[in-house]
Amino acid sequence: MAALAALLFSGQALANGHGSDAPPPPKPDATTAPARVILTKQGPKLVDLKGMTLYYYERDTSGKTSNCDGKCTQSWTPLSAPTDAKAVGDFTVITRNDGSKMWAYRYRPLYTSPADKEPGDTNGNATTLQWRIARPDE
């Protein structure tokens, strides 16, 4: 009986690709987009992975830097990216003036608003005319 169990186990291991001299298959790419598009009554918008609304800052014009520094970041939180982050589709990584990395969508830096308390809130949209909900078609 033990011999039969050993034979079945080794056959299953070989069927799964284990137990041979072949190298294991490569691991899937761990890079994922930092945000997603959701549909709302007002149209599609970008949200982070927690469902919080993302915003564009009108003063971010170059597409390669963020103009929200100092006190601005106390009111608007840049969507931070790991130091080794790479572009994923339309999501790019930019370097902020302080050297930290943040995510951008089509080279436009992305931020969250502390005025938004729950996923889907859009309270930051009403704070000033310089901030707008990030939409995939803009």
How should each PLM-predicted stretch be described?
Residues L14-E138:
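Compact beta-sheet-dominated domain cores in extracellular/mature segments
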Residues M1-A5:
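Sec-dependent N-terminal signal peptides
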